[in-house]
């Protein structure tokens, strides 16, 4: 685990740059979600779990 944490600090600059570019896409998706009111609560819970898994995968790269 320690080794993994060290590697992340080194590639943090690249991660930040990629994050900013993706921010626009995420905002678009959020607007679309707000439009669809039906089943928002259930979707939100499912999305949170998916997001956490996705982040862990991105970190490993």
UniProtKB/Swiss-Prot annotation:
The keyword Cell wall biogenesis/degradation is assigned to this record: no
One Gene Ontology term, aspect cellular component: nucleus
Keywords associated with the record: Chromosome, Developmental protein, Differentiation, DNA condensation, DNA-binding, Nucleosome core, Nucleus, Spermatogenesis
InterPro entries: Protamine_P1
UniProt-annotated stretches for the region Disordered: 1-61
Gene Ontology terms for molecular function: DNA binding
Subcellular location as annotated: Nucleus; Chromosome
Protein name: Sperm protamine P1
Major subcellular location class: nucleus
Tissue and organ expression note: Testis.
PROSITE patterns documented for this protein: PROTAMINE_P1 (PS00048)
Disulfide bond sites: none
Protein family according to the UniProt entry: Belongs to the protamine P1 family.
GO terms classed as biological process: chromosome condensation; sperm DNA condensation
Leader sequence segment: none
Function summary: Protamines substitute for histones in the chromatin of sperm during the haploid phase of spermatogenesis. They compact sperm DNA into a highly condensed, stable and inactive complex.
């Amino acid at each position: 685990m320690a080794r993994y944490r060290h590697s992340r600090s080194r590639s943090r600059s690249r991660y930040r740059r990629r994050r900013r570019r993706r921010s626009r896409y995420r905002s678009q998706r959020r607007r679309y979600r707000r439009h669809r009111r039906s089943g928002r609560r259930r979707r939100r819970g499912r999305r949170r779990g998916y997001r956490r898994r996705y982040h862990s995968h991105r970190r490993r790269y």
